[in-house]
């Protein structure tokens, strides 16, 4: 019963996110109401608000997926894998996912780019920075990096990724997210200590 309940919870969230993205894309983020999203998703307002207390939380569901992927890759990485390899592996996994979900990811990034108030929640934020820094400071992965250096490296990666994703969503970012991630990995390799 618990597995069924958890699966239904995930399915409902996915239906709400899909409906929200579709409406945001068709009508603009600011023009869409929570009531319209509930109707388009085929759920009650109560169900919608139980899953997402505000409109921006529907968009925030996407980076939360990516954070969960990041956490899974980091947890599955051998303890002695160097931090750079762990960070690059996680970035590649997320990039492949973003390419597989290019339609909805592109819509989300275009919305983020068109609504400046949403950008701080999505772009290189402290939560992402701390996840990357934690990998670099992990003593099991070798000598931990000085925190200042770890924050600088994390900021460089995340800033480059944010800029690349905004360009990609606008149609100027190249072929795939995976290609862009490879370019970032290649160009930023010299900053690793």
Q: Language-model features: where?
A:
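Short hydrophobic/aromatic patch on the recognition helix
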Residues: 43-52
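C-terminal peripheral helix-coil segments that are non-catalytic and often amphipathic
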Residues: 133-138, 170-193
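Hydrophobic alpha-helical segments that form the core
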Residues: 112, 145-167, 179-188
């Amino acid at each position: 019963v618990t597995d069924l309940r958890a699966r239904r919870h995930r399915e409902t969230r996915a239906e709400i996110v899909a409906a929200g993205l579709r409406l945001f894309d068709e009508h603009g983020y600011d023009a869409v109401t929570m009531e319209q999203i509930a109707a388009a998703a085929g759920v009650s307002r109560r169900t919608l608000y139980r899953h997402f207390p505000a409109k921006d939380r529907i968009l925030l569901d996407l980076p939360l997926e990516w954070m969960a992927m990041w956490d899974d890759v980091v947890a599955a990485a051998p303890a002695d894998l160097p931090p750079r390899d762990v960070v690059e592996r996680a970035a590649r996994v997320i990039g492949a996912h973003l390419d597989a979900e290019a339609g909805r990811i592109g819509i989300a990034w275009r919305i983020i780019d068109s609504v400046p108030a949403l950008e701080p929640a999505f772009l290189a934020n402290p939560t992402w920075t701390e996840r990357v820094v934690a990998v670099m400071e992990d003593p099991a992965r070798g000598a931990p990096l000085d925190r200042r250096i770890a924050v600088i490296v994390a900021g460089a990666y995340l800033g480059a990724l944010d800029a690349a994703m905004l360009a990609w969503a606008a149609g100027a970012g190249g072929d795939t997210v995976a290609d862009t991630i490879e370019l970032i990995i290649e160009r930023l390799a010299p900053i690793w200590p």
